[in-house]
A protein has these predicted regions:
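Hydrophobic positions on the alpha1 helix immediately C-terminal to the Walker A/P-loop
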Residues: 161
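Conserved glycine(s) of the Walker
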Residues: 156-158
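A noncatalytic interaction/capping subdomain that flanks phosphate/NTP-handling catalytic cores
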Residues: 1-154, 164-171, 178-283
Length: 283
């Protein structure tokens, strides 16, 4: 059993990273200085002062294993076991982790950045799930305070669309993992995350959809079921249990009933950004 409660005075700035991602605040404590510096560079846009956080703060403690295991050539999803008290145990090829039932504490034993990143993603996905939200593999772009989230299979054009939008001067919230959640009385929100291209910013989510290629760019309505199938494939499942799957299905269903389902058919040119700008400006 690991004692993971935060000390009353909070962690010192040089011993921990305090991150704020999509309204979720987490402190990451890493003993290895080199790894801590690497994480600080990676998460630089999302680092905040721990003393200014009035909301609930989660804590992740990462330590080196007693006996190191070799990193695999090809990684698979970790095995997940839910304990009777609701805690989760994750077992990867070269790391192990324990997450408390309330999502506020995690202990990771492993080497390098990957175990820490993996557990952070699970913690964020669980926090979003408690809000009725999702963590989605996709690209989210924003214009005049409104955002559109697009998801799809590998090669669908998510990174390409993000690059085209950035070239047009648009704001890319994220082009790898996008956080979305319902805000009581305010509709859905979309926010960037630190992975790959990501901004510490959020916007009102006004459309969710899929991508397709063509020589002419256009924004068109799409059946919610078609978007839903792709959304479920690309939403990060925080725990592979009936509870986790049920929460994901419920959140996806609500999202598709409250946010416009669309399809962006786009060419690899400036017309893609123009189609998005027009739709979001009039949405």
């Amino acid at each position: 059993v690991h004692s993971l409660s935060l000390p009353p005075e909070g962690p010192t700035a040089d011993a921990a990273l305090c991150l704020r991602i999509a309204g979720w605040t987490g402190v990451v404590e890493v003993g290895d200085a080199g790894l801590r510096d690497s994480l600080r560079r990676m998460f630089s846009r999302f680092v905040v002062s721990p003393r200014r956080q009035g909301s609930e703060v989660a804590r992740l403690v990462a330590v080196a294993p007693a006996q190191a295991r070799p990193a695999p050539v090809i990684r698979e999803l970790p095995r997940v076991l839910r304990e009777e008290d609701g805690a989760l145990r994750l077992a990867g090829e070269d790391y192990d982790a324990t997450l408390s039932a309330d999502g506020l504490q995690a202990h990771v034993e492993g080497q390098g950045r990957f175990p820490v990143e993996t557990v952070l993603k699970v913690m964020l996905a669980r926090a979003l799930a408690r809000r009725g939200g999702l963590l989605v593999h996709g690209v989210a772009v924003a214009h005049q305070g409104k955002a559109a989230l697009f998801t799809g299979h590998s090669g669908a054009g998510k990174s390409t669309l993000g690059a085209l939008w950035a070239q047009a001067g648009g704001q890319v919230l994220s082009d790898e993992l996008v956080a979305v959640w319902p805000e009581p009385g305010q509709g859905w929100r979309a926010a960037g995350t630190p992975w790959n291209v990501g901004q510490a910013a959020e916007a009102e989510l006004s459309a969710v959809g899929t991508l397709a290629w063509d020589v002419v760019s256009r924004w068109e309505p799409q059946a919610a079921g078609d978007v839903g199938r792709m959304l479920l494939v690309n939403a990060l499942l925080p725990e592979a249990t009936p509870v986790g799957r049920g929460g994901l299905l419920g959140a996806a269903g609500r999202l598709l009933s409250e946010v416009s389902p669309v399809r962006l058919v786009f060419a690899r040119d400036a017309s893609a950004a123009a189609a998005i700008q027009g739709a979001l400006a009039n949405g």
